[in-house]
């Protein structure tokens, strides 16, 4: 009987020692120094951040304070041969491969508010597509040329969503087509052509402050105000150095930015004065990060200054056989010569992921 009691006491003491060790280990993780805890949590993706916030009160407060609400755009790549797509998150350097059979034969035209505008050149079919929810909103058919640009004002779920494109440019006239969501047909407007004769095509279209800004390949900027059905060509041109092989135009909180790219020179950053409608060269992006692609670009006032994602131009590149992104620092101290090669505009485009991404099935397939 004595030996049994002793063995039971030994087992209890062992269990107490084990439980005390586990508690010490648990307490060690909970009582991490504040700066170390924030450093660890700052490197977690949103999904793991939410999980970590359930550990204890201290972790919850740290996770919530560092949780990124305004996520960075993702880059979506389109296959030339099949219906496979690749989504790439540059902030976490993660990607996922997707298949959308319903988009077979379609090419991308524009991206805004988490939606893609897709066009089928064989059937002339237009549709809005959300790659995160797979929601699809069909539009009336419209013939489009290969290099024709199209844009829309906001998500198609809004009644104020407006599609815009220039369908024809002759010596005397320019034809514009617009379409409001839930309308029955396209609206056609014809204006006198005031563009210069060396005009070839529109390269960039941006919607801001209720107006569509349209940039031609020669640098002319035209405005279309849908509320007034008014078309105007501005007289000035942006300062452009010889040797430019492409440009990107975007907006941020009503301000219009234009970036000219060069093969063997650093980019030129310009900002439009909305009072005089003249372009002014800038040596900095003012803290913005511009995610640039040929058909549409995104801009964000990034908060990750300590990580270097600040005052940058983010571009899609091929590194070896891997698709990735590079950040080019735009400021007065930038002395590194940036070499950029123009890509096929229909290969990729930036898109904003939804804030409830964690609740979608797509989130669990990220690798």
Swiss-Prot record:
Query: What Pfam families does the annotation carry?
Result: Beta-prop_KIB1-4, F-box
List the biased-composition ranges (Basic residues).
Answer: 1-18
Q: Outline the segment boundaries, as ranges, of region: Disordered.
A: 1-24
Q: Which PANTHER family match?
A: BNAA09G35900D PROTEIN (PTHR33127:SF62), TRANSMEMBRANE PROTEIN (PTHR33127)
Please state the span of the N-terminal signal peptide per the UniProt entry: none
Q: For the F-box domain, which residue ranges apply?
A: 26-81
Identification of the protein by name: F-box protein At3g56470
């Amino acid at each position: 009987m004595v030996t049994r009691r002793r063995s039971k006491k030994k087992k209890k003491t062992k269990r107490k020692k084990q439980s005390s060790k586990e508690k010490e280990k648990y307490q060690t993780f909970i009582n991490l120094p504040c700066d170390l805890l924030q450093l660890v949590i700052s490197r977690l993706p949103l999904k793991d951040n939410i999980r970590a916030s359930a550990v204890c009160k201290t972790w919850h407060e740290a996770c919530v304070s560092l949780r990124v609400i305004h996520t960075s755009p993702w880059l979506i790549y389109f296959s030339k041969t099949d219906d496979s797509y690749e989504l790439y998150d540059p902030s976490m350097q993660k990607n996922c491969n997707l298949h959308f059979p319903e988009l077979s034969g379609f090419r991308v035209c524009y991206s805004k508010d988490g939606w893609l505008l897709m066009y089928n050149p064989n059937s002339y079919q237009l549709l809005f597509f959300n790659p995160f929810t797979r929601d699809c909103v069909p539009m009336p058919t419209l013939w489009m040329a290969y290099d024709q640009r199209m844009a829309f004002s906001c998500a198609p779920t809004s009644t104020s969503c407006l599609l815009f494109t220039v369908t024809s440019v002759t010596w005397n006239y320019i034809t514009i087509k617009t379409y409001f969501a839930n309308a029955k047909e396209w609206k056609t407007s014809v204006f006198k052509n005031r563009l210069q004769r060396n005009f070839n095509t529109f390269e960039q279209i941006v919607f801001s402050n209720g107006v569509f800004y349209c940039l031609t390949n020669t640098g002319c900027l035209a405005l279309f105000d849908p509320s007034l059905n008014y078309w105007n060509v501005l007289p000035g041109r942006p300062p452009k150095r010889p040797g430019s092989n492409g440009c990107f135009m975007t907006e941020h909180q009503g301000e219009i930015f234009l970036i000219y790219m060069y093969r063997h020179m650093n980019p030129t950053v310009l900002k439009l004065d909305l009072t005089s409608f003249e372009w002014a060269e800038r040596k900095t992006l003012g803290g913005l990060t511009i995610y640039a692609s040929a058909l549409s670009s995104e801009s964000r006032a990034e908060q990750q200054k300590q990580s270097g994602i600040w005052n940058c131009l983010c571009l899609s590149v091929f590194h070896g056989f891997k698709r990735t992104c590079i950040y080019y620092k735009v400021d007065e101290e930038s002395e590194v010569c940036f070499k950029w090669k123009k890509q096929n505009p229909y290969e990729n485009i930036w898109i904003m992921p939804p804030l409830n991404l964690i609740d979608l099935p797509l989130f669990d397939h990220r690798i």
